[in-house]
Amino acid sequence: LSLYAFLLEEEDELADRYLQTVKGYIDFYSRLLGPYPYEKFALVENSRQTGYGMPSFTLMGSRIIRFPFILHSSYPHEILHNWWGNGVFPDLGQGNWSEGLTAYLADHLLLELKGKGAQYRFQEMMKFSNYVNKENDFPLSAFGYRDSMASQAIGYAKLLMVFHMLRTEVGDENFLKSLKRF
């Protein structure tokens, strides 16, 4: 597996931090879900403040990648999109389930491993409670991409909770076996 960091300006220390971190997350998720689906991974810095997971790379903003907490929050989320969203592609006509599953296995799971899973789920339920109401709620099958706090609460938080309920119902072993087969 070839790893790259394409930065707007040469910053060896920053590049090294991202390259070391991505190796650990790709190893972790490969053990959890199956082999990494591409021959390379690249962090690509851009001037817009984005965080997009693309097939075999992630496009992240120049200010964003310099926040130290990003290495263990948004970055693993974008790495995981190589499995969900850019490895197994959702049929957007049926709903973009990949954001909820990626949030569940990156944002949530990494905190759960530190004993903070329930706290994270509560925080996500509060987002749903605060931003979604009868007028702006919609079924998960209608979620494409986030374009508001309400759509984020539905497509990420609500769907994350669906995956948590599924895992709770079938158990860890069956849940992970199913993801590996998928």
Region locations from a protein language model:
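Acidic/His/Gly-enriched intrinsically disordered linker/tail segments
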Residues: 93-95, 99-161, 165, 169-170
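Short, compositionally biased low-complexity segments
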Residues: 1-4, 136, 169-177
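Alpha-helical packing segments of well-folded alpha/beta enzyme cores
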Residues: 21-26, 79, 159-162, 166, ...
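Acidic/polar loop patches that form or flank catalytic/metal-binding clefts of enzymes
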Residues: 35-41, 90-92, 113-122, 173-178
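General structural signal for alpha-helix termini and helix-helix connectors
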Residues: 85, 89, 165-168, 181
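Short alpha-helical scaffolding segments that buttress acidic/His motifs in well-ordered protein cores
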Residues: 105, 178-182
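Surface-exposed acidic, glycine-flexible loop patches that form ligand/cofactor-binding
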Residues: 31-35, 166-173
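Juxtacatalytic substrate-recognition/specificity segment
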Residues: 1-82, 86-97, 105, 109, ...
